[in-house]
UniProtKB/Swiss-Prot annotation:
This is Superoxide dismutase [Fe]. SUPFAM superfamilies: Fe,Mn superoxide dismutase (SOD), C-terminal domain (SSF54719), Fe,Mn superoxide dismutase (SOD), N-terminal domain (SSF46609). Belongs to the iron/manganese superoxide dismutase family. Gene3D superfamilies: Fe,Mn superoxide dismutase (SOD) domain, Iron/manganese superoxide dismutase, C-terminal domain. Fe cation binds at H26, H81, D164, H168. The keyword Metal-binding applies. It is an enzyme of class 1 (oxidoreductase). Induction: No inducing conditions were found; seems to be constitutively expressed (at protein level). Part of the secA-sod operon. Expression is partially under translational control of BpuR; increased levels of BpuR lead to decreased expression of SodA (at protein level). Destroys superoxide anion radicals which are normally produced within the cells and which are toxic to biological systems. Its EC number is 1.15.1.1.
């Protein structure tokens, strides 16, 4: 059975970039909704004992076909948001670990180029979805987009950071100004925490 992960910080901790009300609704309503729905689906399948969301998403086609879309949406939503909120955790956000920095420079040229790629990808998403920095087994670090709540894990990519461009992530503060939200998210992003995610993925 899955549980809503604790944020580990207050809802207003990401101000002024993302407002407290948005953070509260996003975490306690949307993220929690994916948790509750995922548990309900697993219970219906007699799989409530499953607790590794990565394995669920990687092996989604092993589940009955009538449940696969529900699993994709809700296991994806759970996994995506868990990483999203983790990487917004306050801290030494400009502390990019040396190995991660070297690999970013090798793949993109610089951190600024990576940020520009993420922003461009986020802005090109039509409707709802996510812009991702992922580690691809064949080609290393790359920026991709995924629609809706689809997880990079379904494609054997390892997610490092994700920008949620569903309107629920920003509409209270930014309305239709997605570009301002994306800029704000990149300013709020804790690169030390993202570096820790990267270390976990490569080790």
């Amino acid at each position: 059975m899955f549980k809503l992960p604790e944020l580990g910080y207050d809802y207003d901790a990401v101000e002024p970039y993302i407002d407290a009300k948005t953070m509260e609704i996003h975490h306690s309503k949307h993220h929690n909704g994916f948790v509750m729905n995922l548990n309900s689906i697993l219970e219906k399948m007699g799989k409530i004992h499953l607790t590794d969301v990565s394995n669920i998403l990687k092996n989604i086609h092993d589940f009955p076909e009538e449940f696969q879309t529900l699993i994709r949406n809700n296991a994806g939503g759970y996994s995506n948001h868990t990483l999203y909120f983790r990487t917004l955790r306050p801290g030494n956000k400009d502390n990019l670990f040396e190995k991660f920095k070297d690999d970013i420079n090798a793949a993109f040229g610089s951190l600024d180029v990576l940020k520009a790629n993420l922003k461009d990808t986020a802005m090109k998403i039509f409707g709802s979805g996510w812009a991702w920095l992922v580690l691809c087994p064949e080609s290393g670090l790359k920026v991709i987009s995924m629609p809706n709540q689809d997880s990079p894990l379904m494609n054997s990519y390892k997610p490092i950071l994700g920008i949620d461009v569903w309107e629920h992530a920003y509409y209270l503060k930014y309305q239709n100004r997605r570009i301002e939200y994306v800029d704000a998210f990149l300013k709020a992003l804790n690169w030390e925490e993202v570096s820790k995610v990267y270390n976990e993925v490569i080790n």
